[in-house]
Every structure is written in C-alpha cells, then in structure tokens.
Design a protein with these regions (language model features):
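Conserved catalytic cores of phosphodiester-cleaving nucleases, focusing on short active-site segments
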Residues: 133, 153-155, 161-169
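Metal-dependent nuclease catalytic core centered on acidic motifs
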Residues: 1-46, 60-96, 170-201
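Long, hydrophobic/aromatic-enriched structural stretches that serve as scaffold segments
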Residues: 88-105, 119-123, 128-129
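Acidic-basic catalytic patches of nuclease active cores, encompassing PD-(D/E)XK
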Residues: 107-142, 190-200
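A short acidic/basic microdomain associated with nuclease active sites
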Residues: 135-156
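Nucleic-acid endo/exonuclease domains
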Residues: 44-67, 112-113, 118-131
Length: 201
C-alpha cells in the first residue's frame, strides 16, 4: 500500500504528482504566514522553520519548479529535502491505495496537517509506523477508512486477532506550562523595550 523506497531520479516526477494531488497552495500559504510572523518577531525564525519543516522544504521545491520547470538534478541529491519528498511519496501511495472516497478524506487530513504542526507530527508518525510494518511484509489498514475501530492502524495477521496500534507523538513542549511559542512571542514584545532601555544606559 505505501511506497517504501524512492530513487533520487524520481524526485521531480513524485513532486509533480504530489502538487497535482495535494495542491501546493496548502504549503505555500502556510510558509507565507510563517514568514509574516517571523518579520514581526525575528525570534520565531528557527522555531517556525522547525515546526513547519515539511512545508518549507516543499516550498523550496515549488520555487525551483517555477524557476526551472522541474527540480534540478543536483537539488534532488540534497538530503535536506528527503523528509518532505519521503512524506510526499507516502501520501501519494496512501491516497492512491485508499480509493476515491477514503483518498479524499486522507487528502483533507494532509491539508489540515500543513496548518497544524501537531497534526503533521501525528500523520508522519502513522506513515512511519505503517512503513515499518509494510516493509516486514504485513498488511496495514487505517481504521478511519474502514469505519471499524478508533485506533490509528491495524496490522492484520499479527497475533490471534491482528494488532491495533495507537500512535502518539510527543513534541519538545509536551507537558510544559509555558510553551516555546508563547515564550518567543513574549520575548518578541519585550525585546524592543529592553533594547531601548539598554540604549539609554
């Protein structure tokens, strides 16, 4: 069901298919929003690039495609794009494997993941776990497409009744009372006032 291997020579074709299935407006608009936030608070730069890494990598590929008509071969060798192109090929194989109705539901889930880093982490974790079991030769189903169960993945043939998997991703902020984003926003407001105070000393 999921593609588990990809050759770098396939990157331009995979990206082109991904754009046609998912539409680059979803990551381009998110990157635009992030860049506007960064202009307002430079302290958010590293944080937002990390939280929206897949969107930023895909936006670079979109820009290259617009400039050159396709992703240049030397850029396909850049390991910095591997997480995004790996995500793209997995999403494509999942959408194609689900059928029309379930594929559309999955597409919408991908659209939402570009707007919410926690959703993106969860989706990538599910795809990673599914890839592990598929490479072992197991058959994986998403209960959200079958309407049976409220777990994330079902591995048929493991144990007596199969294996239900619930994927949980944890961010650096999990369990903290004050999250990094809130701290950076606060420091962004505070920084100009501190700088003006220091300048007067």
């Amino acid at each position: 069901m999921l593609t588990t291997e990809l050759n770098t020579t396939d990157v331009p074709a995979v990206f082109s298919r991904f754009v046609s299935v998912i539409d680059d407006k979803h990551w381009m608009s998110q990157v635009k929003l992030c860049n506007e936030e960064i202009r307002g608070n430079r302290l958010l730069d590293r944080y937002l690039h990390s939280e929206y890494a897949i969107a930023y990598q895909l936006s670079q590929m979109t820009e290259l495609t617009r400039r050159y008509g396709s992703i240049p071969r030397q850029y396909c060798q850049d390991a910095a794009i591997y997480p995004a192109i790996g995500f793209a090929v997995q999403v494509l194989s999942a959408v194609e494997g689900f059928g029309r109705v379930d594929g559309e539901l999955f597409r919408r889930r991908v659209h939402g993941a570009f707007k919410n880093p926690a959703d993106m982490r969860g989706l990538r974790l599910e795809l990673s776990v599914a890839t592990h079991f598929i490479r072992r030769g197991d058959h994986v189903t998403w209960p959200e497409t079958t309407g049976v169960g409220n777990f994330d993945l079902f591995i048929e043939g493991l144990g007596k009744d199969g294996l239900e998997i619930e994927c949980k991703s944890i961010s650096d902020d999990k369990g903290r009372n004050i999250h990094l984003r809130e701290s950076l926003d606060f420091f962004g407001v505070l920084k100009p006032q501190i700088e003006s105070t220091i300048a007067g000393l």
